[in-house]
Amino acid sequence: MFSSESWDQVESNLSARKIVLEVCDTIVMRGGRLAGAGIVGILQKMEEDSTGLIFGKRTVVAMDGGLYEHYPQYKRYLKDAVKEILGLEKSKNVVIEHTKDGSGIGASLLAASNSKYEHDF
């Protein structure tokens, strides 16, 4: 692992740094596009199961994580993939928002919904 002082001692030229930047951007693009495709897949399944109730209205997708929060290019790649796959019209209703502690909240909601359907209250 490099410390900030170690980076000063690393010799590199501009060409090598540009290549590293391109490789990193390619990896981030792939990750964002895969995440976007995953979101679209889930939304399409929900649309199929609800017989057309999802894409006709506003749908909010909560994203948790530092990459989405702190890396604007990742967020752009993800949203571009959703727009590309769904098309401009359907994607207008899909809103992707950052959330803190999404996994804890999601687990709580899942447990609550499971309890609701598990028992007739």
Which role does the model predict for each range below?
Residues 1-121:
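ATP-binding/phosphotransfer module of carbohydrate and carboxylate kinases, centering on a glycine-rich
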